[in-house]
Amino acid sequence: MASAGKPALDDSRRGTGSPKIKARENAKDTLCRNITIYGRCRYEDKGCAFNHDPHKVNSSYQSDSKKRFNVDSPSFTPSLLSSNGSSPTSTPATTKKMTTISPKAANAAPFQPRSVVSRSNASTPGLRQDTVTPDWTVAEVQEFVPQGFDNSHLATLQGNGNGPITSTSPFDPFVTTSTPLSAGGAVGPVQPNPYSHDTAAALGGAAFFPGAAGFQQPVQYHLYAPIGPHSQNTLGYQRNVHDLFLPNDFREELQKKAAATLQTLPNTQLPAQIDYFHSLVPLDLNHQKNATIFGFPSWVYKAQSSKDGNFYALRRLEGFRLTNEKAIRSVQAWKRVCNGSVVTVHDAFTSRSFQDSSLIFVTDYHPLSKTLAEQHLGAGQQRFQGRQNVHIPEQILWGYMTQIANALKAIHSNGLAARVIDASKILLTGKNRIRLNACAIMDVVQFDSQRTVTDLQRQDLVNFGQLIVTLGANSPTVMHNPTKAMEHFTRAYSPQLKNSVFWLLNGMQKDQDRNIDIFITGISSQLMSTFDSALHLDDQLTSDLSRELENGRLVRLMTKLNFVNERPEYEHDRQWSENGERYFLKIFRDYVFHQVDVQGDPVVDLGHVISCLNKLDAGTEEKITLISRDEQSCFIVSYKELKKALESSFQALMKPARRMH
């Protein structure tokens, strides 16, 4: 049986084998490839059937092209035209065949190219020239002119400094306008917009070449540009860690403030709730009672509001009894004071939650803030005890003075007086950033005071000057001897600062008008320096914020990948089965997150994940190799194709018809 079947197998192979190569009929007119490649053919005298003369081939090609494209060739005439109803001897079959040509087609004029009329001197179209006409040229071909082209746009398209463009230029289909193109001009090349998502639409060709159905490119939020000004003079190839992330100290500061805001105190003896506030946490570092400033012991707590969920600072005056209801209403005027150098007052009320009669003031909470006394006075005494005190730099003192002057300007403009300008009640909320605190308390505690507002405002100026002298001497008790304090201040600082402080200390004198506006006019040069520093800080914060712009884009990409991959409800749906683009999206997920090393251990590389997702987000042309889990399929795709597949799959998932399944 085996021997019998073998000839049949040979016959089948012989029957399906390649046929014998026959000699080409036009081989003599075809140039030998060896002549083209090597310049000679060693088989020329050994039976090579191809032509070995290049000049002969070119001449034959030109003659052939003249035969095919000669415009003076005889006009086309239908073969049945001569016998259409004119031959009496035509057979019935021929007559039936001739009836298929309509009389209008039979009487049509013979075809003649339009260019013959323009190049012929004869008066009749049927007369031909005996001279040899040249071949066709591109300029003689009638150009295609679309309807709806605007000639007014030629100036903008040709405005490249090269002069007008002749009509022999080819038509550019990527420009659309509203009126027909004039005969005297054509369209020049248009530079594409590299930032446009739809290139055809950007060049104006959407009307002629409608784009294929696909996903719509999202906003280019991955195109980041460094926002100036740039304070560091680095070379183009040099990089700093601050170019990629927030400055480390700034990030740590924000994280610490967030942790301090959310801090709780378990097993506390404090009340669980005070009015509409709960979760009280004490903020005082000194647990000794001190009634020097307000006349009552005061305590500060952090609490969360049940109304809006925000955190506030509660200042409690222990043992205060409200005798006049109008006193607490004076806080309403302080609610209208909105200034960056004043801690905003929100509310004031009495409470017995601490088992006594207490007065509670509600103000803004600034986490991890210090007082000027803690920053400069207390730290100076502990650290430099027995040494010469270190003076605060003069520029920092000027910054403090301009901010306090700004606060007093807002307070005095509302017909109020701060009344409390003390180093222990001024908060340092940032780098050289201070705010006046506890200003409204004295208006309630000393409501029955007979002093006028003008007198209290003058006293604010005196307290202001004493504060600067205290900070300059770096000692809280220096004002017990004012003469010695000013001598010490004069030796350490400039005459301008000394004269400004001396003017403030004499604020109670009646010899001349003294108010905060006059003081601000006197320190206007320092105000400009502080304002310039604030502008630099604003630029720095804007630059830092720009690096965090759209920092959730990688999360969106991972969310889309998980939405598309391995959906169990569409497992048997042919339109949604994991084939095609959805299949290599699944493999791409393994490529990003499920890689293993040579030993088969999982590779946990955050840099690889971020790099792949960034390239996917940008849609780069870089190609990667994706291999299936069974190692039977291999794909070579680019990130651009992956991005398009992801967007189209996600858009298909969002269709209403898909959601109805």
Swiss-Prot record:
* Gene3D superfamilies tied to this protein: 1.10.287.3700, 1.20.5.5160, 6.10.250.3160, Transferase(Phosphotransferase) domain 1
Chain coiled-coil ranges: 525-563
Chain positions covered by the region annotation Knob domain: 564-661
Q: Where primarily located?
A: cytoplasm
Residues that bind ATP, according to the entry?
315, 364-371, 424-425
Give positions of region: Pseudokinase domain: 263-524
UniProtKB keywords: ATP-binding, Coiled coil, Cytoplasm, Metal-binding, mRNA processing, Nucleotide-binding, Zinc, Zinc-finger
Q: Name one GO cellular component term.
A: PAN complex
A GO molecular function for this record? protein kinase activity
Q: List locations, semicolon-separated.
A: Cytoplasm
Top-level taxon: Eukaryota
Give the Pfam families listed for this entry. Pan3_PK
Biological process annotations from GO: mRNA processing; nuclear-transcribed mRNA poly(A) tail shortening
Q: Where are the zinc fingers (C3H1-type)?
A: 26-55
Residue ranges, compositional bias (Polar residues) = 115-130
Q: State if Oxidoreductase is listed as a keyword.
A: no
Q: Which parts of the sequence are annotated with region: Disordered? A: 1-26, 53-130
Compositional bias segments (type: Low complexity): 75-102
* UniProt free text on domains: The N-terminal zinc finger binds to poly(A) RNA. Contains a pseudokinase domain. The protein kinase domain is predicted to be catalytically inactive because some of the residues important for catalytic activity are substituted and it lacks the equivalent of the binding site for a peptide substrate. However, it has retained an ATP-binding site and ATP-binding is required for mRNA degradation, stimulating the activity of the pan2 nuclease in vitro.
HAMAP family given for it? PAN3 (MF_03181)
Function of the molecule: Regulatory subunit of the poly(A)-nuclease (PAN) deadenylation complex, one of two cytoplasmic mRNA deadenylases involved in mRNA turnover. PAN specifically shortens poly(A) tails of RNA and the activity is stimulated by poly(A)-binding protein pab1. PAN deadenylation is followed by rapid degradation of the shortened mRNA tails by the CCR4-NOT complex. Deadenylated mRNAs are then degraded by two alternative mechanisms, namely exosome-mediated 3'-5' exonucleolytic degradation, or deadenylation-dependent mRNA decaping and subsequent 5'-3' exonucleolytic degradation by xrn1.
Please state which protein family the record places this protein in: Belongs to the protein kinase superfamily. PAN3 family.
Q: How does it assemble?
A: Homodimer. Forms a heterotrimer with a catalytic subunit pan2 to form the poly(A)-nuclease (PAN) deadenylation complex. Interacts (via PAM-2 motif) with poly(A)-binding protein pab1 (via PABC domain), conferring substrate specificity of the enzyme complex.
Q: What is this protein called?
A: PAN2-PAN3 deadenylation complex subunit PAN3
Q: What is the lineage of its organism?
A: Eukaryota, Fungi, Dikarya, Ascomycota, Pezizomycotina
